[in-house]
């Protein structure tokens, strides 16, 4: 699990440095619309036609294991076999990224607070439920690897919600970004 957070932290660092060193030159009027959503690309090779078209249409740039798609508001992480494993969705204009404007996973909305996310993703505590009892709405794991954002990991959904606060108890915090993994 520690390796997972190191990878996610690396993504944040790469995105920061990639955008800090390059002036944001994104004309919103000329930004190509996302022809395919992140759901289409998860689990597919970057050489797959739908993924390759998305990368080309959105002027994505490869940085290590990442396809940085600033005009589309997302970054794609690929494994050693070039399979898209994670989509990092930016919900606001930040770090040179345009806000992702596609549908968010699990009925989440871009203006949801931590409290509303926990309500939407919550499961009633039931000791007989499989794969096990969960506290209502609480993430399976949480941390603040960059000491700026709180990362709430919902393993059962393959989703990590990143908030604009390092505090796990700031129920008014809004969503900064969402990672969706396959």
Question: For the regions a protein language model found, what residue spans apply to each?
Answer:
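Bacterial N-terminal signal peptides that target proteins for export
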Residues: 1-9
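Phosphate/dinucleotide-binding and metal-coordinating scaffold of catalytic cores
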Residues: 27
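A cross-family detector of function-defining hotspots
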Residues: 31, 40-93, 104, 108-182
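Nucleic-acid endo/exonuclease domains
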Residues: 34
